[in-house]
């Protein structure tokens, strides 16, 4: 059994940003990078935007490290915009 079988996605940077924004909107308190990555992966699987993998079966519930880094970059950009605060891999919305 392969343990390191993460799933890649083929979303554009713009669509990825939209999904991360949706995830942030749904959060009431603090949230994590892992939560944002799981949200993006869920919608990629629902929308058919996962990259083809050997075996073609979903044998993982984890987003690929490269795509999770893309999610992290989006979150960091939103931090720089002043809309969320970061504490390591935890984030919190800043009140309007």
Name each model feature, range by range.
Residues 31-35, 70, 86:
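Alpha-helix N-cap and coil->helix boundary residues
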Residues 89-96:
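Short, cationic-aromatic polyanion-contact patches
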């Amino acid at each position: 059994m392969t343990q390191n079988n993460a799933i890649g996605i083929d979303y554009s940077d713009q669509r990825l940003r939209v999904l991360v924004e949706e995830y942030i909107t749904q959060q009431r308190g603090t949230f994590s990078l892992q939560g944002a990555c799981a949200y993006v992966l869920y919608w990629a699987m629902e929308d058919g935007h996962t990259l083809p993998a050997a075996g073609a079966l979903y044998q993982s519930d984890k987003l690929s490290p490269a795509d999770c880094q893309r999610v992290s970059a989006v979150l960091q950009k939103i931090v720089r915009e002043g809309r969320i605060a970061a504490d390591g891999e935890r984030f919190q919305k800043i009140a309007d």
